[in-house]
Amino acid sequence: TSYGNGVHCNKSKCWIDVSELETYKAGTVSNPKDILW
């Protein structure tokens, strides 16, 4: 499920798809991998 701003949730896990973040698109995020929490 996508909540916008790159945030997705699947069951109890949420993550940020950094490819969807404006900061990533602007080249200010160096790590292309998802940020999990």
From Swiss-Prot:
<protein>
    <recommendedName>
        <fullName>Bacteriocin lactococcin MMFII</fullName>
    </recommendedName>
</protein>
<dbReference type="InterPro" id="IPR002633">
    <property type="entry name" value="Bacteriocin_IIa"/>
</dbReference>
<keyword id="KW-0929">Antimicrobial</keyword>
<keyword id="KW-0044">Antibiotic</keyword>
<dbReference type="Pfam" id="PF01721">
    <property type="entry name" value="Bacteriocin_II"/>
</dbReference>
<keyword id="KW-0078">Bacteriocin</keyword>
<dbReference type="GO" id="GO:0031640">
    <property type="term" value="P:killing of cells of another organism"/>
</dbReference>
<feature type="disulfide bond">
    <location>
        <begin position="9"/>
        <end position="14"/>
    </location>
</feature>
<dbReference type="GO" id="GO:0005576">
    <property type="term" value="C:extracellular region"/>
</dbReference>
<dbReference type="InterPro" id="IPR023384">
    <property type="entry name" value="Bacteriocin_IIa_CS"/>
</dbReference>
<keyword id="KW-0964">Secreted</keyword>
<keyword id="KW-1015">Disulfide bond</keyword>
<dbReference type="GO" id="GO:0042742">
    <property type="term" value="P:defense response to bacterium"/>
</dbReference>
<comment type="function">
    <text>Bacteriocin active against Listeria monocytogenes and Lactococcus cremoris.</text>
</comment>
<dbReference type="InterPro" id="IPR023388">
    <property type="entry name" value="Bacteriocin_IIa_dom_sf"/>
</dbReference>
<comment type="similarity">
    <text>Belongs to the bacteriocin class IIA/YGNGV family.</text>
</comment>
